[in-house]
Amino acid sequence: MSWLHPTDKHLLFTKNDKEDPRLGECVQLLPKDDLGNLSNYDYDFAILGYPDDEGIGLNGGRVGAQVAPREIRTPLYKMTPHLHSTTLPKILDLGDLDKEKPLAERHEKGREIIASIAQSGKRWVSFGGGHDYGYCDSTGFAQTFPGEAVVINFDAHMDVRPTDKGLNSGTPFFRLLSEFSGQVDFAEVGIQNQCNSQFHVTWAKSKGAQIFTLDDINSHGLLATLQNYLKDKKSKKIFLSVDIDAFTSNEAPGCSQSWTTGLFTKEFLEALQWILKNHDVRGMGIYEVSPPLDSDKRTSKLAALLSHGFIFGNLNKA
């Protein structure tokens, strides 16, 4: 079987105007069954979709995120390059991970793909799907950079539920911290008081996690919080995990669990650009965008905007 399904070529938007280039013109599509030949492609950024919300359903959430990868690619590939960019990105779209095999096998294959990208020195953006796929991204990253990996999770929820009741969208960082205990720096940012149990917070802290609640962010600012956390991590590699429910429901209504409280786009983009300019950020995953629950495609466009910021923040730095 093929583990990846190629992205629809019709998503590669173009105005057919050399004076108005779009990101869709910067994308190569990985052909089916060519996953083993990634080293043959010339690219700066890989994009991978996880069209799978089984883990959300298993955690009692509202499903719909399985259609997110396509709905995020659509506005992303219509965007223009950044106004301050002097070069165009070379993007390799790997397509979407197959979801016919059992969930655990899908997670392991996703992890294998991410590790392959990370080991090649390339950067990536992934689109969920449930946040259980944060396991694929974070562990594929951590195994590639043992002892120098930093994972920052922007989220309303801890997502450190134990796996004794099975895998689901609440378990990715329980798995990461259990498997890579003492080998990865891990921070949770934007944690909301009404969304988490004290048991989960205590467990994460026992594994070395740094926790910054939404109250902390509101008191000190997102940028200042991240600057302080990263001040002694200049030499390390970073992966950013973004559960879209970290944002307010006004800005990201299309997700399984949204609240009126949360992060704001403006502050996040400011912090993202600072991190990209000052640190080595290898990848970013965006999870739990649920287009059936969205309003005017706001949440899909937010995810696309964050991806655009990641791509050009890295490209302009170079």
Predicted features, each with a name:
Residues S2-A318:
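Conserved alpha-helical scaffold segments that buttress catalytic/binding sites
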